[in-house]
Amino acid sequence: MIITIFGPPGSGKGTQSSLLIAKYNFKLVSVGDLLRNIISSESKLGKGIKDTVESGNLIQDEVICKLLCDQLALIDGDFLLDGFPRNLNQAHFLTQVLQKRCNRDVDLVIELQLDDNIAIDRLKDRLTCLDCKSIYSISSFKNTTCAKCKSTRLEKRIDDANMLAINKRIREYHSQIEGLREYYKDKLLTINANLSVDRVMQEIESKISCNLI
């Protein structure tokens, strides 16, 4: 099975993806993680991507699609795509790549729907472990080490540090989502991401189970 999960910034894509791959034994392809790894390499490409991300702009489709294509070449079997596609052009690209590689397409699409004000509050309060990608709330997590992997490398993500960039990312998401909904309308599962992590996971599991019967 091939599942993709998308939603606005702060909707919990990474958190829910981690829970899903643990439960269903999927492999994970996270576009966000791929980009952050390149940024941390401090290569010429990484510096260019960092500047784009800090300004709240989206990475060019050709860069994203090339990264994804390289990653998919390493994966067999069931997998989950976190944060891709982000627009209709990327959706068409994904269909073409999957059909060419394995004569398949995406089976299920999970859309996490989140109110803008909640998204902004979450992003302003988000703290990320750079090593295991665990996410914490700055206002409630007072430790200096990650509870999961004990790393001390806890930081705000560069794309969460600027309110103008946050608002721009949210606006950009809304400008693209209708095209994706229409493209995947027969495979789309809509989830209320305003709820707690556990409640969101329960809703996703329930809807996935119905589609597996």
Curated annotation (Swiss-Prot):
Zn(2+) binds at residues 129, 132, 146, 149. Monomer. It comes from Wolbachia pipientis subsp. Culex pipiens (strain wPip). It is an enzyme of class 2 (transferase). AMP binds at residues 36, 57-59, 83-86, 90, 157, 169. It holds the Pfam family ADK. The keyword Nucleotide-binding applies. ATP binds at residues 10-15, 126, 135-136, 195. Residues 125-160 are annotated as: LID. This is Adenylate kinase. It catalyses: AMP + ATP = 2 ADP. One of its GO terms (molecular function) is ATP binding. Belongs to the adenylate kinase family. SUPFAM superfamilies: P-loop containing nucleoside triphosphate hydrolases. Gene3D superfamilies: P-loop containing nucleotide triphosphate hydrolases (3.40.50.300). GO terms for cellular component: cytoplasm. Residues 30-59 are annotated as: NMP. Keywords: ATP-binding, Cytoplasm, Kinase, Metal-binding, Nucleotide biosynthesis, Nucleotide-binding, Transferase, Zinc. CDD domains: ADK. It is found in: Cytoplasm. Pathway: Purine metabolism; AMP biosynthesis via salvage pathway; AMP from ADP: step 1/1. The keyword Nucleus does not apply. GO terms for biological process: AMP salvage.
